[in-house]
C-alpha cells in the first residue's frame, strides 16, 4: 500500500472495536500486516483472546497484536482501556469504530423460505422482529458507543502527529433513505449540526418507536434503529470533522460483506470489505476529512 508509506514511516498504534470476528478481525489483520500495532477489543474477553491467537496462526507478527476488553455500551469500560493505551503506547494514531449490531432478531428459517420462493417479494416484517429494547440497544452500540469511544480516546489521539478516526457505517444511513423530509433536513444541515442536535433526533426516534409511530413520523421502517443509528453516525462524523480539523475523520460503508450482521449473505468477502476502512486508516497526510465513502468512492451524505 504505497500511499500509506509516509504515514507508516513512524511506529503507529491502532484500536479497533468489535474486533473478535468478521470485519473487525480482518481490519486488525490487515493493519497489523502493514506494521501497525493493533489493539483488538471485544465485549467478550475469551473470544477476543481467541481472535488474537487466530491472527497469530495466520502469520501475523505477534509483536503487532495486543488485546483489551471493551464493551462500548458500558461507560466503565473506557477508563482501563485509556490507561492501558497510555501506559503501553503513549499515544493513539488510528481509531476504527467497528462495533455494531443490527437491532433486529431474524427468523432465519422464515427468511430462507422467503428467498427460496423465487420472484416473491420478501415481507421483512414477517422475518425480522424489532422491539423498543432492541432499538435502544442498537443506538447505544452503533451511535452512543462510538461517541463514548471517541470521547475516551481523544486525548490519546491528540498525542499523535497524524491522528485519524474511521467510523464504519452503512449506506442505509444515507439521508435519501429516510422518508421524512424534516428528519433529513435536521440531520443534513451541516452548518447547524451539533452533537446535541443529533442526540435530540435519536431521542425523538425512540419516543416515536415506543408509541408505534415510526412510519407515521417518517422514520425508516426497514431495520429502523440500525438505519437511523448509521444516519446519526454519519452526521456526528461531520460534526467531529469540523470540530477537530487536525484529525482525519471519515465514515465508510464497506459494502455488503459476508458477516454475521448480514446473515453471511453479502457478496463481498471480509478481506474485500475490510480493505476500505483500512485504506482510510492509512491515508496519507493531508487527506480529506468529514466524508462518507462507499467502499473507495466518496458518496454524498444526502
UniProtKB/Swiss-Prot annotation:
Q: Which InterPro entries match?
A: CBR1-like, NAD(P)-bd_dom_sf, Sc_DH/Rdtase_CS, SDR_fam
- According to the UniProt entry, what is the EC number of this protein? 1.1.1.-
For this UniProt entry, the molecular function terms from Gene Ontology, in alphabetical order, are: oxidoreductase activity; oxidoreductase activity, acting on the CH-OH group of donors, NAD or NADP as acceptor
- The domain of life is Eukaryota
Where does the chain bind NADP(+)? 20-23, 43, 71-72, 98, 226, 230, 257-262
Its GO biological process annotations read: saponin biosynthetic process; triterpenoid biosynthetic process
Keywords attached to this entry: NADP, Oxidoreductase
Supply the PROSITE patterns for this chain. Answer: ADH_SHORT
Q: In which tissues is it expressed?
A: Mainly expressed in flowers and flower buds, to a lesser extent in leaves and, at low levels, in stems and roots.
Cite the SUPFAM superfamilies for this sequence.
NAD(P)-binding Rossmann-fold domains
What does the record say about its biotechnological applications? Answer: Soapwort saponins possess anticancer properties and are also being explored as enhancers for endosomal escape in targeted tumor therapies. They may also serve as precursors for vaccine adjuvants.
Reported function: Component of the oleanane-type triterpene saponins (e.g. saponarioside A and saponarioside B) biosynthetic pathway, leading to the production of natural products with detergent properties used as traditional sources of soap. A dehydrogenase/reductase that, together with UGT74CD1, mediates the conversion of QA-tri to QA-triF; UGT74CD1 may transfer 4-keto-6-deoxy-glucose to QA-tri, which is in turn reduced to D-fucose by SDR1, thus leading to QA-triF formation via the initiation of the C-28 sugar chain.
Q: What is this protein called?
A: Short-chain dehydrogenase/reductase 1
Q: Which organism is it from?
A: Saponaria officinalis
Q: What is the lineage of its organism?
A: Eukaryota, Viridiplantae, Streptophyta, Embryophyta, Tracheophyta
